[in-house]
């Protein structure tokens, strides 16, 4: 399972789900579902989200048990 810190980073950057979704080219619901861990993001989506925040993917997404 992949855990994420999308919500934390959105708060740091003062971004609403709608704005992040617009920047990465998805619907707001997609961001909400990823934040809640309902679905794992595609590699492209994970990459684009990390790019918006200017951090490596592993700063936002972690594979549980990958220590």
Stretch-by-stretch model annotation:
Residues 26-39:
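Recognition helix of helix-turn-helix/homeodomain-like DNA-binding domains
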Residues 2, 13, 42, 53:
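Flexible coil/turn residues that form the inter-helical turn or adjacent wing/linker of helix-turn-helix
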Residues 36, 55, 65:
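Short, conserved catalytic or interaction motifs in soluble domains
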Residues 4-23:
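Short basic helix-loop element that most often maps to the first helix and adjoining turn
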Residues 51, 61-67:
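Short, charged recognition helix plus adjacent turn
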């Amino acid at each position: 399972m992949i855990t994420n810190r999308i919500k934390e980073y959105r708060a740091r950057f003062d971004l609403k789900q709608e704005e992040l979704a617009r920047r990465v080219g998805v619907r707001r619901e997609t961001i909400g579902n990823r934040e809640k861990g309902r679905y794992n993001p595609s590699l492209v989506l994970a990459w684009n989200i990390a790019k918006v925040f200017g951090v490596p993917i592993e700063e936002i997404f972690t594979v549980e048990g990958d220590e």
